[in-house]
Amino acid sequence: MANPLYQKHIISINDLSRDDLNLVLATAAKLKANPQPELLKHKVIASCFFEASTRTRLSFETSMHRLGASVVGFSDSANTSLGKKGETLADTISVISTYVDAIVMRHPQEGAARLATEFSGNVPVLNAGDGSNQHPTQTLLDLFTIQETQGRLDNLHVAMVGDLKYGRTVHSLTQALAKFDGNRFYFIAPDALAMPQYILDMLDEKGIAWSLHSSIEEVMAEVDILYMTRVQKERLDPSEYANVKAQFVLRASDLHNAKANMKVLHPLPRVDEIATDVDKTPHAWYFQQAGNGIFARQALLALVLNRDLVL
């Protein structure tokens, strides 16, 4: 029986049901415990990054190599026919899809990954981030890390801090955790960078508790996960950026009343929002979180490219 993710496009976290998420996370745990260096030995995967990336691109490409796949692609669209000759995204994807078994794609335009699926034929497209919209594979590694550290994905108190308007990671993570029972959210952001209304409406429709706060201190003692984000300079005008960049900064001294097993997560890169003295505390878990990207992305690639995956 084929697994439900075989040859499936993964554009939004909402493309994955709760059962799908559990399957990916279980597969990630197996691959972390038992590496499979030849699982994708005869597959070719395109790594198409139309927007700058460090962790996501290297994590995906490392995942591909560690599963034995061959990797082709680019990290700067300026040096492609699309960038230099004006080729359309549709034509670029139409051609690349004739070469490969899957396409991993990041693009600055919201909806670009969904558009790519219309031109990729039977080749699955995995969204590595489209503008400020979705970042589903970051969410998978976030869920994997939360499950590893907390032992569950339900009945959690989760605080999200910083840029909640443009931060695609918090949109995807909130939608994913809303699929599990009993979770409660605390949103801490300047008014200019508040969580979008459609996310709040979704939580209301599901009867999920949430609240808005003006400081981290207000919720520190309550939370199991403190998810920090940077203010995204590239998505703000200079005056707006200057006003909000230092509004929410986490320091080690702020953690004095945190739960013993509370973990601080961050999608990275960080700028000033987490002081380096936090790194030395047992709550800091963002580097381990980044490392888990290998296993979450390996799991997704393995499932999308293997009809009958047995590990």
Swiss-Prot record:
Stated EC number for the protein is 2.1.3.2
Q: Per the record's keyword annotation, is Magnesium included, yes or no?
A: no
Q: Which GO terms describe its molecular function?
A: amino acid binding; aspartate carbamoyltransferase activity; identical protein binding
The reaction(s) annotated as catalysed by this protein in its Swiss-Prot or TrEMBL entry are:
carbamoyl phosphate + L-aspartate = N-carbamoyl-L-aspartate + phosphate + H(+)
Q: Which PROSITE patterns did the record assign?
A: CARBAMOYLTRANSFERASE (PS00097)
Query: For binding carbamoyl phosphate, which residues are annotated in this chain's numbering?
Result: 55-56, 106, 135, 138, 268-269
Pathway of this protein?
A: Pyrimidine metabolism; UMP biosynthesis via de novo pathway; (S)-dihydroorotate from bicarbonate: step 2/3
Keywords on this record?
A: Pyrimidine biosynthesis, Transferase
Any one GO CC term of the record: cytoplasm
Enzyme class comes to transferase
The question of whether Transferase is a record keyword is answered with yes
Which branch of life, at top level?
Bacteria
The Gene Ontology biological process terms listed for this entry are: 'de novo' pyrimidine nucleobase biosynthetic process; 'de novo' UMP biosynthetic process; glutamine metabolic process; protein homotrimerization
The record lists L-aspartate as bound by 85, 168, 230
Subunit record text: Heterododecamer (2C3:3R2) of six catalytic PyrB chains organized as two trimers (C3), and six regulatory PyrI chains organized as three dimers (R2).
Q: Which family does it belong to?
A: Belongs to the aspartate/ornithine carbamoyltransferase superfamily. ATCase family.
Q: What does this protein do?
A: Catalyzes the condensation of carbamoyl phosphate and aspartate to form carbamoyl aspartate and inorganic phosphate, the committed step in the de novo pyrimidine nucleotide biosynthesis pathway.
Under what name is this protein listed?
Aspartate carbamoyltransferase catalytic subunit
What species is given as this protein's source? Answer: Escherichia coli (strain K12)
The encoding gene is: pyrB
